[in-house]
Amino acid sequence: MSVSALSPTRLPGSLSGLLQVAALLGLLLLLLKAAQLYLRRQWLLRALQQFPCPPFHWLLGHSREFQMNQELQQILKWVEKFPRACPHWIGGNKVRVQLYDPDYMKVILGRSDPKSRGSYTFVAPWIGYGLLLLNGQPWFQHRRMLTPAFHYDILKPYVGLMVDSVQIMLDKWEQLVSQDSSLEVFQDISLMTLDTIMKCAFSYQGSVQLDSRNSQSYIQAVGDLNNLVFARVRNIFHQSDTIYRLSPEGRLSHRACQLAHEHTDRVIQQRKAQLQQEGELEKVRRKRRLDFLDVLLFAKMENGSSLSDQDLRAEVDTFMFEGHDTTASGVSWIFYALATHPEHQHRCREEIQGLLGDGASITWEHLDQMPYTTMCIKEAMRLYPPVPAISRDLSSPVTFPDGRSLPKGFTVTLSIYGLHHNPNVWPNPEVFDPGRFTPGSARHSHAFLPFSGGARNCIGKQFAMNELKVAVALTLVRFELLPDPTRIPKPTARLVLKSNNGIHLRLRKLQ
């Protein structure tokens, strides 16, 4: 009697054979992947022969040098040794070429390379694909559509709203400060800049500074997302969306995104309800000034269609973040720079008091009559650029002015922090010297890039500069800014330049 091929006595042998085949296939796939990684590494090394860099680990790259919160200090060391460019190995097969030279910056910013798929992609769950993340024709369409929201006629009345927001913050400080105590200013400044963007861009009635319960959770979410995105870029195990979603950091990021979206969704829904009552565009225009959100809601794409709900929220999320967090960074570091350089602070105060007279307010007409204060603002942004770096993926080969070249497919990081601290570009770069920005002084067109440059420069740079001037002017006529020697800020690179230990200042009320 024959034994069936499916009988129990045959199963162990069959299973063993299947396991052997599976193991062999797994080993083969592993060898193929290893060969692929080896070949890619060799290609990267050949492509970077013209770009020397410090020694790096075969698997971890430069990760030991770029520990969390130590990146800026490392960049300063590299700029000294490699003043034009330096490859930064994130892992054994992942590298970004950091650029520190204005000629190199000019070449890249004059091209149309897309934003880097790596770090910028990690921001997408938060701010969506709005003006910051879009590339190519969609970016061009959105940029052209949003430009009217930053026209002179729209920006001019915003100054009064900026004044209101700054005065609320200063009134609060007047109640809080005592002669010997110090204040962590970044959180209050963040609330103030959020208040400003809510009033100017979204016509918010009231003040988020006075009723800050919802706004505090939004600001906390933005702070968390800044840290989480930055950490994810540098964690080779978190490059996978699936792995990241399952990690504690991924779950925290998801919750922070939800909080941020709840804030922006609430703003959009309130405006849509208001516009349903107000009617068509011309009726609205006759009643009140149009703001950023009006421009978005009434805008038409080239095919005649309105923005989708997804595109609308992406633009609101983008502008809400960029319009308050980068400006808060700028204001905070400017205050710190002035606090540590009292002679320049005193000269700014004299200029502002001479301009405003007995009136403590500031108007649109005053903004171009503060040359020395503007020089100090720019010098502070050179030392502490609000956005420390931006990245591009090369869509075609590039050759730099010194003859060195990179092939298509490389990611380049334009280190604005490195550029602004490059001794080949700025002599004695760590010295605070507003004279560098004396009107008419000569410098490279791409030596100073606090708002990026080229076609993709910051669309809201004039709005931001106006807000910086208003905040500095009104603060200096009410307070003397003094440093807290026990808590010196430690600049740290995130999406926006922050301090690892906050920005603590002593405020002395002026009589």
Swiss-Prot record:
Reactions it catalyzes: an omega-methyl-long-chain fatty acid + reduced [NADPH--hemoprotein reductase] + O2 = an omega-hydroxy-long-chain fatty acid + oxidized [NADPH--hemoprotein reductase] + H2O + H(+)
Bilayer-crossing regions: 11-31
Its membrane topology: Single-pass membrane protein
Record's subcellular location: Endoplasmic reticulum membrane; Microsome membrane
Gene Ontology CC annotations of this record: endoplasmic reticulum membrane
EC number of the protein: 1.14.14.80
Keywords assigned: Endoplasmic reticulum, Heme, Iron, Membrane, Metal-binding, Microsome, Monooxygenase, NADP, Oxidoreductase, Transmembrane, Transmembrane helix
Top-level division of the source organism's lineage: Eukaryota
InterPro entries, alphabetized: Cyt_P450, Cyt_P450_CS, Cyt_P450_E_grp-I, Cyt_P450_sf, Cytochrome_P450_Monoox
Family: Belongs to the cytochrome P450 family.
Any Pfam family matching the protein: p450
Stated name of the protein: Cytochrome P450 4A5
Gene Ontology terms describing biological process: arachidonate metabolic process; icosanoid biosynthetic process; kidney development; lauric acid metabolic process; linoleic acid metabolic process
Propeptide residues, chain positions: 1-4
Gene name as annotated: CYP4A5
Positions contributing to heme binding: 322, 458
Induction behaviour: P450 can be induced to high levels in liver and other tissues by various foreign compounds, including drugs, pesticides, and carcinogens.
